[in-house]
Amino acid sequence: MKPTRFLFTLGVAAWGCAILAAQTAPKSPTPKAPPPKAAAPAVPAVGTAPATATDQNAVVKRYCVGCHNDKMKTGGLSLEKFDANHASADAEVGEAMIRKLQAGLMPPPGGPRPAPDVHAALVKALETDIDTAAGAKPHPGARVFQRLNRPEYANAIKDLLLLDVDAGDWLPLDQKSANFDNIADAQALSPTLLESYLNAAAAISRMAIGDRNAVPVDSTYTNAGYVSQHPWDHIDGTPFGTRGGMVVNHVFPADGEYVFEVTLQSGANARFEDVDISIDDARVSLLEYETQPAGGADGRGAVHIKTDPIFVRAGQKSVAAAFVKKAEGPYEDLIRPHDWSYAGGGSGGPGITTLPHLRDVIIKGPYHVTGLSETPSRAKIFSCRPTLQAEERPCAKQIAAKLGAEAYRRPLANDEIDRLLPFFDDGAKKGGFEVGVRTMVEAILASPHFIFRLEREPAETVNAKAGAYRVSDVDLASRLSFFLWGEPPDQELLALATQNKLSAPGMIEKQAKRMLADPRAEALSTRFAAQWLRLQDVDKVHPDPNFYPNFDDNLAADMRRETELFFNSIVREDRSALDLFRADYTFANERLARHYGIPGVSGNQFRKVQYPDDTRRGLLGQGAILVQTSLANRTSPVLRGKWVMEVLMGTPPPPPPPDVPVLDDTADNQGGRMLTTRERMEIHRKNPTCNACHRFMDPIGLALDNFDVTGKWRQRENGQPLDTRGDFYDGSKVSTPHELLDALMKRPEPLLRMFTENLFAYALGRRAEYFDQPTIRAITKAAAASDYKMSSFIMGVIKSDAFQMKSYQPTSSQ
């Protein structure tokens, strides 16, 4: 192993061992001493206790203990010994009750239920006692550490070195907890993961500074088969007057000559094409593609064409390869008269042409290296330029201080700067000043201070081994920035933090408003909302093309983007969080609007559009939600009902008992007639074991059954009229999406609480525990004053004790 590499490995391994030891500590110990008083207490004021404690215990005994007793323990819960007068004594059980009662799920329909005022009084009594105890002794919770996940790592590199990288080239897939990839308890460490960070540091430092000794390599970029190649589709980033193709960000390591090769796939009768190769929007070559025999030039259906050597200067550049448009105007695809995007790969038969598919772009080089031109990355790194050998080490020290402070998200102490200089010395001995700086940059990127978000505990808290404390302004800046932007703090935020001004009254709110107005706040939609709403699950469903020929991965991507833009608009315009469920508009391009039956939308650009009727509203009318809760060949009211209960309401049904047959085992026809999904479900629900949960889920899912597998509106299934009638668990009749929305809006508290809980967990990088529920309730109740504006929830999380404070976290002695 090389000496420098050994130092990297040794340093990171030592930190890794310390953090691994810390991971064995209890997740969130209750602090033994009360913390300093928070500037904005995150627990509600004490309310008036409803009725008497004896009355509340009588309600629990009459309506709950019959099932939730020591013998039956329905749902794993016994309330025989639970005292509603002192719910805070067993807050975990109390919170479980509140969640079910507030949603109206308990007592279950069909059995005796208390009067609405009695039901509400019980919920309020439980909340009041738990919230009162929490107000007397706040528990901000704790986490051991967080490390940068893939998106955060890529954003940090972009800010630090002005490079767009795909962190997935080096880092393994992020594990999720509570459906988020930034939750600390899922961010396990391993030697393989640490090695991945080291490999990333080595590669990225070389990309940023360049390499005068670069040797020719082949870099291959592959275009997914579903990417559109149709004559009417223009790919963003490609020149105007082109169609299809692909765009890649490629780092050219040095000034020199490069060869660009493209791989095309098509049938035997593909038409002649011209392929435009451009760098940063400037054409550098025009390649001619000619029809090939069946099987392609390489016998595997592929044709390879390449440019002559082209001189390119060092740095990251946008490389585009696209087909030149042959004509303008309407087209008709006779091969696949649907919305499929990929017509190449097979012969259309005599007299019919097919469209080729641009599969790969291969960049080869550099050849005949002539030097290194100035790049944005080099300009950022080299804040000084020594002219004498004696100036090299002082210059390296200046670079270490400046770059290190930005990478570590805090100022560096002198001894920390001094510890980076041996890496410069080692590299400079081998290759001069620039190699020394590159080696030092590699050390910075491999440092635990860059990879991990480590928060320092005050000495008095460590010595006392107990209590809670306010996090430093520097750590608070990182919490705020990674929450709202998904990336490190910018210069303004970091400057305030290093001067200890961020915690001044009103300052964090002022900064949060500034950051929410910044385009980078879109991370709340692409990162938070996308994970909360399980948008990644859309890719797990592949509607059967025999039944749904108009659906493809392009449309799936449009649906995901629709939901992201929709959520972002609510944040940006500071609308009510209830608009997530009741909005009468969405964002669509021409294809998605056509799929939904919305007229008057042309072009590939997304824009805000009004729904023409009330069949669609909010999230439950959007394709990304409807597709992910379907199966390949039919809708699934069960999955849709379960999704609403779990994701939106926070009351997931229990898993099915073992050995219970699935719905697909139920006969799909009867008397020579195909059964509808509802008819098969009714047969399935005759099993009492199944009915216990399906009576909650099924009416929700059936109310959405007018949306087919792809989210398209329909009136019939298997030739039979749809029957979507059902009874919501509060007794409301629901048979349409609009009636389901009305039923949900009658009791919006579970929806708002679950939204707050997910926002809270994402912001803090840890699961929301039972002791966090008073804070979550306080945020939700406070938001009511503004009609639940989105900013009220975001500011409520930011101002909470849980966000600004931390409980002491003991490390393991092992």
Task: List each model region and its residues.
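Short, intrinsically disordered, low-complexity terminal/loop segments
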Residues: 2, 108, 813-814
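A conserved hydrophobic secondary-structure block that centers on an alpha-helix together
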Residues: 231-318, 322-343, 382-440, 448
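Aromatic- and Gly/Pro-enriched helix-to-coil junctions and flexible linker segments
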Residues: 20-225, 236, 322-388, 397-422, ...
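Long, His/Glu/Asp-enriched segments that create or flank divalent metal/ion-associated functional microenvironments
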Residues: 236-242, 246-267, 272-281, 286, ...
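Active-site-proximal, well-structured secondary-structure segments within enzyme catalytic domains
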Residues: 223-228, 233, 557
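Long, contiguous hydrophobic alpha-helical segments, chiefly transmembrane helices and signal peptides
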Residues: 59-60, 64-67, 77-82, 94-97, ...
